[in-house]
Regions:
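Metal-dependent nuclease catalytic cores that hydrolyze phosphodiester bonds in DNA/RNA
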Residues: 1-83
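Conserved RecA-like P-loop NTPase helicase motor core
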Residues: 642-652, 707-832
């Protein structure tokens, strides 16, 4: 069987035919709309007659000496009418269609590809192409037509294939090299207990095209145990690309280190770490246009040379390598990285590259079809709250008022005059009414025919356009005034909601608000498209509001029974309306269907059925509990039965007893400890008491602050890492004479920056104390979640409070014992941990927990250290 190189029609034309500058001033709103126009596609397709075929799959195969190039895609529509064939390419946009004088070249090229493929298949001598642009808000439609002879299309298309041939040759040759190396690749270590079975579970899941949920305790080697079998599956054509997605930067580095290790063992595999635009941008401000950024100017003229140079020299596309080549070729490093991902075998990045409805990688997932991809989701317990966040949308009343003030203050009358002159100059001429026949009868709207640049253009007024404020789309008041009026209408609706809100309130119908919001969105879009002389500050603020509004309207269209709409009065006095995605299951599942298989893993996936349910798992998907490889004798877990963090029992006496517990635990062994508290306020109370009554000269305390920059965080952690290379066994073996003289105690907050994702090995951390059960603070969203899941037949308190809280506890406890050589203690300070409702959530390796009191804990700790020392002799 000949090898294949596959590419979509869209990727082919965008990659080969692009040129010029990056310019988000004109591309931003239009391109975002193009990706969000699925509703428009369906609407137009439904209105067409029987002669209209929607979503027609087309494929072209081009043989070479060694392999075949397959170009494939879906034509939005094919119209067979009166013996003629028309290829319909639909594009949604927020732009005023009266100002769209010609279709975009890349859109024409995409339609021409479909026209050639269909003509070749049906042996048509000529064919018509129609570009259908539809305004998403008003549903106005503008058609552009062009007729092509097959012979002309063939010459054009074959030149396109010829230009792509260099890239296809490289892709095929690299794939052959990669597959051969995968076949010879062996697991780089001796398998730990249970690790071989875990590797097998991952491979079988990919084979069966399922999802796998893995509870993987620290030390299992979850990164290599998921990446290795996925790479082996790719060697059997069960995956073209591996996506390793995580919420934290440090785990992305671990994934790249794993690929590097496998490359050292002979694997030929190109990997890339995708970095956020704000972090990798060379400029102080991310102004992506040729006037503000030299890397944006002419970017598309140079980018393909940069890609080919790096591709043929490197296998690991790290941030530093991307920046090096971006500087060499003067291209945008962010867009450079995205383009390189098309040629990478492994793509490492944030969750949002797959799951975020606005940021996902459209070059892979934009056409809605399933790719031959495998998704590895690390620290997947974080995906639940991230999923809720990505698929929810707030709207603050104060944002509208602030924008209104700014519009009045900063947009000058001269700008309005210039805009009016431009509108007058571009006024509509040469219009004539056209009586519609045939398929047009499906669209009983106002029709106008125009001739522009020699191309037939048809304008159709949409139903929603007629429902506006009675003003023609062609004649507008000043933009600033129009924006101000619409902001006032929106604010009036929000003010009415605010009067009815006491704390927070669930709401049902917000259509009266959405209508002016939709119009406001369209007017801002027009303004951003037309005004080239807006100050940077005004444009930046307008764009920021515009994208927030885009997100809100998109989520409004998306909402279903998994959403709750509510208003609330915020602590800072502001008023907010929120579309709250209480259950992200369906949205996340839809994203995972973009690939062949998904492996989700975490050290704190308990209870696993809870996560499987809310993260899009099905009954036929798998779950597995990986066996812990650590020696249980190297750890002791103690539960206090005489203190609690319950709000109803908080008192100076309770705070004192908790501070005393800390003292009784740390006094038996000098070393590094972290104490985790339910809140900053609680932590500060305990710290003050500890400092006053218990702190000794041999102890030093570090206290987490509410806002710590990266430098302060690193300082905090580096104080603990000072002894990372020390051998704890030898230190303890020296007993009293050589024992560490200093104790370092970190006072931290549960669920904060030090409670998850930090790796303190060996003597860097020998003890963790967790104060409280980690229950989230009672608030409107937690109560909404509780009520929703109670109504859904689940335990609302568990889903909203207990499970999220326990996850934070397990994450904090997991900061100690990071390697097989580590020794340490875990102390849980809350009597609720002795209840079954919490004990049932303990991981299997926590079977041997011991109850203590403030009077007995010191003896228990001393016995543990002495017993371990005696055992090691």
């Amino acid at each position: 069987m000949a090898g294949e190189v596959r590419i979509s029609v869209r990727n082919l034309v965008e990659f080969i035919l692009r040129s010029g500058d990056i310019d988000d001033r004109r591309q931003g709103s239009l391109e975002n709309a193009m990706q969000e126009g699925s509703r428009i596609h369906r609407m137009i397709q439904r209105r067409m007659g029987a002669e209209y075929q929607a979503e027609v799959a087309l494929k072209y195969t081009h043989p070479t000496e060694d392999y075949v190039i397959i170009v494939e895609g879906r034509a939005d529509g094919i119209i067979e009418q009166n013996g003629e064939t028309t290829i319909d390419e639909i594009k949604g946009t927020y732009r005023d269609l009266s100002k769209l004088k010609a279709p975009l070249p890349l859109h024409i090229a995409q339609a021409k590809c479909y026209a050639y493929m269909y003509s070749l298949q049906k042996e048509l001598p000529y064919i018509r192409v129609r570009l259908t642009y539809c305004n998403i808000e008003t549903e106005d439609i503008r058609y552009f037509y062009e007729d092509y002879e097959f012979v002309r299309l063939e010459v054009w298309f074959q030149q396109l294939i010829s230009d792509y041939r260099k890239w296809a040759d490289y892709t095929w040759q690299w794939r052959e090299l990669r597959q051969q190396s995968i076949a010879e690749l062996q697991f780089p270590f001796d398998y730990r207990d249970g690790q071989k079975e875990l590797v097998s579970y991952v491979y079988q899941t990919i084979y069966h095209k399922r999802k796998l949920f893995i509870e993987a305790p620290t030390g299992v080697g979850k990164t290599i145990s998921t990446i290795f079998p996925t790479v082996k599956a790719m060697g059997k054509d069960m995956g073209d690309k591996l996506f390793y997605l995580t919420a934290k930067t440090i785990t992305r580095t671990v994934a790249e280190d794993t690929f590097s290790l496998l490359r050292e063992k002979g694997l030929r595999f190109k990997s890339i770490i995708l970095t956020a635009k704000e972090k990798i941008c060379f400029q102080e401000r991310t102004e992506c246009n040729p006037e503000q950024c030299p890397y944006a100017k002419g970017h598309f003229d140079r980018i393909n040379d940069a890609i080919y140079d790096l591709l043929t020299r490197e296998e690991s596309f790290t941030r530093s390598k991307i920046e090096e080549y971006a500087l060499k070729y003067r291209v945008c490093p962010f867009e450079f990285g995205l383009d390189l991902s098309l040629f990478a075998d492994g793509i490492i990045g944030d969750y949002n590259y797959l799951f975020d409805p606005h940021v996902y990688l459209k070059r892979f997932f934009g056409d809605g079809s399933q790719g031959n991809y495998v998704f590895l989701i690390d620290e997947a317990h974080n995906l639940l709250e991230r999923g809720r966040e990505m698929y929810s949308a707030p709207l603050r009343k104060e944002d509208l008022l602030e924008l209104k003030r700014e519009i009045k203050q900063t947009i000058t009358s001269e700008m309005e005059e210039a805009a009016q002159k431009k509108r007058d100059k571009d006024g509509i001429s040469g219009q004539m009414t056209l009586e519609m026949t045939g398929m047009s009868k499906q669209l009983p709207q106002e029709i106008t025919l125009e001739e522009t640049d020699g191309t037939d253009s048809l304008y159709v007024r949409g139903h929603k356009g007629k429902k506006s404020d009675g003003k023609s789309t062609f004649v507008r008041e000043g933009y600033a005034e129009r924006i101000s009026q619409l902001l006032e209408k929106c604010n009036a609706q929000l003010l009415s909601m605010k009067r009815d809100c006491d704390g927070y309130r669930l709401v049902d119908d917000i259509d009266m608000l959405v209508q002016p919001l939709t119009r406001l969105h369209a007017v801002i879009s027009d303004y951003l498209e037309e005004q080239e002389k807006i100050s940077l500050e005004v444009r930046e603020n307008l764009l920021d509001f515009y994208f927030k509004l885009s997100h809100f309207l998109d989520i409004y269209e998306r909402q279903d029974e998994n959403y709750v709409k509510y208003t609330r009065l915020c602590e800072d006095g502001s008023f907010e309306l929120k579309l709250f995605c209480v259950n992200p299951r369906e949205n996340l599942k839809e994203c995972m269907l973009r690939g062949r298989s998904t492996i989700l893993f975490s050290a704190t996936f308990l209870p696993i059925q809870y996560y499987k349910n809310l993260l899009g798992g099905e009954k036929e998907d798998y779950e597995v509990y990986a066996h812990s490889v650590f020696d249980p004798e190297k750890r002791t877990i103690l539960i206090a039965g005489d203190v609690t963090s319950k709000f109803s029992r908080r008192s100076q006496e309770e705070y004192y007893n908790i501070a005393r517990y800390i003292h009784e635990v740390v006094k038996n062994r000098h070393g590094n400890y972290m104490i985790f508290f339910p809140s900053y306020s609680f932590m500060n109370h305990i710290y003050e008491i500890y400092e006053q009554y218990f702190m000794t000269e041999e102890e030093e305390c570090l206290v987490q602050q509410e806002s710590m920059n990266e430098e302060e965080r690193e300082y905090f952690l580096n104080r603990f890492r000072g002894n990372e290379e020390c051998d704890l066994q030898s230190l303890i073996g020296m007993e009293i004479e050589e024992e560490e003289e200093q104790t370092l105690i970190g006072f931290c907050v549960l669920g904060g920056i030090f409670g998850e994702g930090i790796d303190l090995k060996r003597d860097s951390l020998i003890g963790v104390i967790v104060v409280g059960t980690g229950l989230p603070q009672v608030g409107c969203e937690r109560e909404i979640l509780k009520g929703y899941f109670d109504e859904d037949g689940e335990n609302g308190f568990d889903y909203s409070y207990r499970y999220p809280g326990m996850n934070k506890v397990l994450q904090a406890a997991g900061r100690v014992i990071r390697t097989a050589e580590d020794v340490g203690i875990i102390v849980l300070l809350d009597d609720r941990f002795q209840q079954y409702s919490y004990r049932r959530l303990f991981p299997r390796e926590w079977e041997q927990v011991q109850p203590v009191t403030v009077d007995t804990v010191a003896k228990k700790v001393e016995r543990f250290w002495d017993a371990w020392l005696w055992q090691k002799g």
